[in-house]
Each structure stands twice: as C-alpha cells, then as structure tokens.
A protein has these predicted regions:
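A domain-level signal for caspase-like cysteine endopeptidase catalytic cores
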Residues: 327-546
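Catalytic cores of nucleophile-dependent amide-cleaving enzymes
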Residues: 472-473, 545-632
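Acidic, contiguous N-terminal accessory segments
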Residues: 7-12, 113-203, 209-212
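Structural motif
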Residues: 203-207, 499-503, 528-531, 550-552, ...
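Long, continuous compositionally biased terminal/linker segments
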Residues: 234-280
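Caspase-like cysteine protease fold
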Residues: 564-565, 625-750
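Long, hydrophobic alpha/beta structural blocks
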Residues: 226-244, 248, 314, 324, ...
Length: 750
C-alpha cells in the first residue's frame, strides 16, 4: 500500500504518508483519533486508501479550497468560507500532497485563516477520509533484458500506474507514471507494481520498430503486449488491425479513443457541460459507454472510422521519434507518461546542401548581402553609408566563418570578421531560408551530426536517438530522470540569472530591461556582467531556476573575460535547472549543461543575428514567466520569428519554471471584423500537472461550458470584453498574425 495513515504521536490527528511520492502531511482533529481502515469504494470520488475517524473538526495547516458535493456527486459549492445544512456530503480539499476527500453526514462550516483551513461539524461525527496518490513518480523500476519479447512483458506493466480503468483515466491526475525500466539479466518486478488486467491485448511483431509505437496504447489501455506476425489490437469478440502503417494507425486510435473517453466521462464523476460533447457529430449512448468495461468500450471505439471525427479532435500535444534501438528502451516510461504519439524511424534523413527546406536553408552559407549580419560572418557587401557599421557586429558568435585562422580571432568587445560595412536598416529578422543559397561553409561544426526528422502535425516534437534533430527537442534520459526529482514549483521563490558576457549588448543598455524581464514580478532576477571562467563555473553550479545567457560561444566554449570555458571538459556540477543560451552555435555547450545537471534548455544550431536573438530572448523570457514549458515556448516564438528555427530544445522539453495562473498555457488570437467587433480565440496547451485530458473554462466570457484543451473560438466580441480578458494575466496575443502581449494590448491602441 503506497499511502500510510497513522495517528500523530503528540498532537490530535493523523499523518498521511505517500511512499511513492515521498510526501507527508498532517490532518488535525479536535480529539485523539484512531484511524480505522474502511472501504475506498464508499467514496464517490476514486481513492486508493480510506480510513474512518470520530471527530468534530478536520483542520489542514495550509490554505485550501474546499469543494462540497452531494453523496451522488452533484456540486453544492466550493470556496474557503461557507456553511452547509445537515446532509451527507462528499468533500474535496485541494491543494494537499495527495488527493484528499472526506465523506460525512453532518452540518458543515468551512473557515480559513492565513495559516489553515478548518471544517467544523455540528457534533462529533464519523468521518471517512479517502486519499489518492498523485503518483507523478514511478512506483518502482522493472529490471528487464532488452530483447524485444522481454521488453513486451515490461511494457505490459505500464498500465499498473493507472488509478482507474474508467473513462476518468483521461484526466491526468488519474494516470500515474509508469514504472521505470532498467536493463538487467533477469526480469524483476518491484513490490508496488501490480499487473492490471483490462482484457485488451496488443499483438505486434517482436521488433523494436513495432513495439515502440504502441507503447502509449499499452499504457492507456492497460494492455498486454504479445508477439505475433501482424499488428493488431484485440478484445473479447473484436479485433482491430493496426496495419498498414502501424505508427499512423496506432496514433489515430489513441487520439480517437482518448477523445471519446473525455466526452464519456461527463456521465461519471464530473457531469459538466462539455463543449466537445455538445458539438460532436457522433450520436452515441454515452451513459451506456460509461458503464462498459474498458475492453468492451474500446471495442465500440474501434468501430468508428477515424476520418469521421478527425476534424473534431484537438491538435495533439507531442510526437516523439524513438530510434528502434534497445538502448532507447529506458525512455519508454517517460514517453508513455506524456501520452506522446510515437514513431520509430529505421533510417534518418540528413540535411543536404541542395535540399530546399527551412532546416537546410538556415544551415547554408548566407546570402552575401546578409552575411555580415551574422557575428563572425564575412560580408562582401559594399553598401556603406551613413548607417553603416563594421560587419560582424550584429551576431553572437565569437569567430568568423569556419576555417578562419586563429590569428583572426578578437577579444570580447572587438568586432570580428572583415571591416567592410553593411546597412543597419537591412531586414535581419525575417531572412527567408528558401532564398539563401550556397554550400555548407560557415554555419555548422565539422563534426556535427544533424538529422531531419519527418514533420509532424502535433504542437511539440521530440527526438530520442543519435544526432542533432533539426526542428525537434533532443530528449535525453538523464534530463527525464531529473524531472522525477524536481519538486513542485514554488511561485514565491523563482530565481532568474541573466549573464551578459557581451560588451556590445551591455552598451545597448540594461540587459534586464532589454529582455523585458522586469515585468516578471514574481521572479527574483539578478544580472551579472563580464564573468571570468571561475566566476562562470560558480554561477553554473548555483541553485538557479533559469539561466538566460547572452554572449559568445564557439567550438572552444563559452567566452569569458579571461578565456573560454568549455563545459564538455570541465568537472563542474551544474545547479541550473533550465536555460536559454542565446549565443551562436550554443548546442554543444547546452548539451554539456544537460549532461552535468540541468534539466532542459534552449540552444542555437547556427550563428544568430543580434536583433532577432534579442527579440526571441524577450519572447522566451515572457513565455517562461507565463508558465509555458520549453517546447511550447519555442513553438510560439517560432511562429513570430522565422529565425526561431535556428533554435532547438535539449533535455526535458516539458520543463517549466513556474505554473501558469490559468493552469494550462494559453495563447490568444484576435482580429477585428467589418463591424468593428472582434473575433477571438484561445489556444490552450496542456502543460505540467495540467496535462493531456485537462478541462478548461473561459469564465471571463461568461461561458458555462468546459473545453478539452485546444482552440476555443468566440465571435463578435466588443473591444471591452477583449480588454477584460487581457487584463487577467500577461499572455501572448496575436493580432492579425502579429505578436503583442495582453498588457500592451490594454495600454496601447492596437
């Protein structure tokens, strides 16, 4: 049993310990109590452990919201100060380290102070307390040989993390983290990992390329994975082929079934008005579906053609490409926990000099007219004039084009490249990669191993395997393990460190103001300039939530005032949690930060222009402040700046440094129509604890409906309503396709 309840040794009350999450909290009572085990099924909401106590009060030593329901689950009220008449209630208390519910028959008074939340009953009552682990860390580690058939047995246990087999498992809080995998000579299963039987079986050939794409299905359907000649999913009395194109069909089935579960769950514990239920073209008996066992319900799902509902489905969050190699098996529990779609490419595409694509385009030599805008680039332009400056002064590399002689290198603060001049009025943030030409010369390291993953329709894209992925998050096992060790975000203690080792950037003004970081009021921001190698090592070893680095990087490392610090060769233990290395070709140094202790970061693959790098830095800073994770933040920045394609995420792309006040991350869009009203939409991105399956509600527009995160659109709203929405929180807002921020929209006549 993962949750243990014991009487307090001194005070009156109980201690609740979650051995999986390694958390503990106290519930105080008004008299000594002896918790007696009770049936978890006595609770309306799902719990894993339940006890009864005799008490006149329940007190939690923290501020919380108390939600009261009838015994049948109907909402009565919620808040922190109210009174209920005598009746039988199911009451939830949030937030506490576990899900906490109590069932009581009494009159109830809820009060709060600045330190505690108290429920007082009209008399001493029998109170049933139920608890459910949030279970965001695995119950244990399965030791397994890494041959395909042994791996099938391990993946078959991923469903043991599910808190329920009902449609409510589409809620992120009812899906625990699958057990970890560890290569071993023999197959071993830890004590707390129990096999879950759903009656679903997935049959695939015993090959990594066939096993990896069905991992999220095995987890979500609690399915047994067995070897067979043709890929299919089987239940009692039905069978559904996953051929041809296993990856596509597995992804479609997950999206379809998950969406139908989100609608079906409105017949269960949370009978809300769901927009997707009201607008679906499907005419199904949702109550009947809810009552079915999982395997029988899935049999109904597979009878519905994906094409029939494809247009109704929200854009899925993540696709992960996992190379079909045994060494990548340890990543599978993390991929399943994110409910990522999975592809397993046997071959990889490499960028070529003649390939006409954005990825290849920004890796080529620049057009001569724009080369000087890239720090270290050499310009052949001769358009010097009144607005001209030395070439090479506009980017963040510390070197010229590849192959430049060592004698051509300059100290910090001096221009690099030629002394020819360029026009500073030239457009440098929207260089069309398809208009550049040339061969690979000055942009990528000699030993770079770039790969071009196939495009995906999901918001985010990750890559597991060798190579530097263009346009995808380079995910690593060590970074994902650090996710498990990361504590919950404390809004009041978020540290941001800005390091500026770029003399020219310092001359432009205060770096914090330049990057707009001062409007991140809940952040403790420190700016450091011109660090030596020793000072940089000390900085990187410090306990910092987010490092924003501005300066020079080349093949020798990060430039400091007394030389270069190459993180690939240092023994420093990095304490920085997340980072943006806003310098030219910072990929290898960013990867070294991950290897030495960081969780995730954003890096560059090429030389980057100062102006566009500054703009991107401002965007990323504000998005991280707004609770976006690294992958989604870069996705939004790339929408605004084509040069955002020069950046990728390394490590755990799901890293956040604070929680969004709205739960999910939000991007607004608005355009004025012919009647001077506004068409408005909000795109919600699942994020952190508010993962895939979360519900959202646009209360600012007085909507009673809940939504599955996706794009929510409203039409013909007055400007005053847009202002009201924008005033709630600082978030990105695209006006006619151009990025502004909600605070700017309110203060200016946009």
């Amino acid at each position: 049993m993962s949750i243990e309840i014991e009487p307090l040794p001194v005070d009156d009350g109980i201690t609740v310990t979650d051995h999986i999450e390694q958390t503990q909290f106290v519930i105080y009572t008004d008299r000594p109590v002896t918790p007696e085990p009770s049936d978890p099924d006595d609770h309306y909401f799902p719990v894993g452990t339940a006890v009864t106590v005799e008490t006149g009060t329940i007190e939690i030593p923290r501020l919380a919201v108390v939600s009261s329901h009838t015994a049948d689950g109907d909402m009565v009220t919620q808040g922190d100060d109210y009174t209920l008449p005598f009746g039988r209630y199911s009451i939830g208390i949030d937030p506490v380290p576990t899900k906490c519910y109590l069932t009581v028959e009494a009159a109830v008074t809820v009060t709060t102070t600045d330190r505690s939340t108290r429920l007082e009953f009209d008399d001493c009552r029998t109170v049933s307390l139920g608890f459910r682990s949030l279970h965001q860390v695995p119950a244990g580690t399965i030791g397994t040989p890494t041959d395909p058939e042994s791996l099938m047995g391990a993946v078959s246990l991923f469903g043991s993390a599910l808190q329920t087999l009902s449609p409510e498992r589409s809620f992120p809080t009812l899906r625990g983290h699958p057990p970890l995998l560890e290569p071993a000579e023999t197959f071993t299963v830890p004590e707390h990992v129990d096999s879950t039987t759903s009656g679903v079986q997935i049959v695939v050939p015993p090959e990594y390329r066939s096993i990896y794409p069905i991992v999220p299905l095995a987890y979500y359907f609690a399915a047994d994975v067995v070897p067979g000649s043709s890929a299919r999913i089987v239940g009692d009395g039905w069978e559904h082929s996953l051929e041809p194109d296993l990856e596509r069909r597995a992804g479609e089935l997950l999206r379809l079934s998950f969406h139908l579960d989100c609608i079906t769950r409105t017949e269960g514990l949370y009978p809300v008005d769901l927009h997707e239920r009201e607008t679906t073209s499907l005419d199904l008996d949702w109550e009947r579906l809810y009552e079915m066992p999982l395997a029988e319900r899935l049999g109904e799902h597979v009878s519905i053609p994906f094409e029939r509902v494809a247009s109704e489905l929200p854009r899925w969050t993540l696709t992960t490409d996992v190379r079909p190699h045994p060494e990548n098996a340890e990543m599978l529990p993390f991929i399943a926990a994110e409910l990522s779609l999975v592809r397993s490419p046997e071959t990889v595409n490499r960028p070529t000099a003649t390939e006409q694509s954005p990825a290849a385009g920004f890796l080529r030599s620049p057009d001569p007219a724009t080369a000087g805008l890239l720090r270290g680039g050499t310009s052949t332009a001769s358009n010097a004039g009144s607005n001209s400056v030395p070439a090479g002064a506009f980017t963040r590399g510390a070197r010229g084009s590849r192959g430049v002689d060592e004698s051509d290198r300059q100290p910090v603060g001096e221009p690099t490249g030629s002394e020819e001049s360029i026009d500073v009025d030239a457009e440098i943030t929207s260089i069309d990669p398809d208009e550049t030409s040339g061969t690979f010369t000055g942009f990528i390291p000699d030993d770079a191993d770039f790969v071009c993953p196939e495009p995906t329709d999901t918001v985010e894209h990750a890559w597991v395997g060798e190579g530097v992925p263009l346009g995808a998050n380079k995910a690593t096992l060590e970074a994902y393990h650090r996710r498990l060790k990361a504590g919950s975000v404390d809004q009041s203690r978020i540290s941001v460190l800005v390091v500026c080792n770029d003399e020219q950037m310092r001359e432009e003004g205060n770096v914090a103001e330049l990057y707009g970081l001062r409007d991140m009021v809940q952040f403790d921001i420190e700016v450091r300039y011109d660090l030596t190698r020793e000072e940089m090592e000390t900085t990187l070893a410090s306990d910092v939530d987010f490092l924003h680095y501005i300066g020079h990087v080349d093949e020798r490392g990060m430039q400091c005032t007394d030389g270069y610090l190459d993180l690939r060769g240092t023994s420093v233990e990095v304490g920085v949690d997340a980072f943006l290395l806003n310098a030219c070709q910072s990929y290898e140094q960013g990867e070294a930060l991950i290897h030495r202790g960081s969780r995730g970061g954003i890096v560059t693959l090429t030389d980057v222009a100062n102006s566009s790098a500054t703009r991107l830095g401002r965007i990323i800073a504000r998005l991280m402040n707004s609770g976006f994770n690294l992958r989604t933040a870069l996705h939004v920045a790339q929408r605004e700046l084509i040069t955002g394609n020069q950046y990728i995420v390394v490590g755990d792309g799901g890293t956040t440094i604070c929680q969004n006040r709205s739960g999910v991350a939000l991007v607004f869009e608005a355009e004025q129509n012919a009647d001077d009203d506004w068409n408005f939409s909000a795109r919600a991105f699942p994020n952190g604890p508010y993962g895939v399956g979360t519900m959202t509600c646009m209360t600012a527009i007085s909507m009673q409906n809940y939504y599955i995160p996706g794009k929510i659109s409203f039409f013909d709203l007055p400007r005053s309503k847009i202002n009201e929405i924008a005033s709630l929180e600082m978030l990105p807002l695209f006006i006619d396709g151009q990025l502004v921020w909600t605070d700017e929209f309110i203060s200016e006549d946009v």
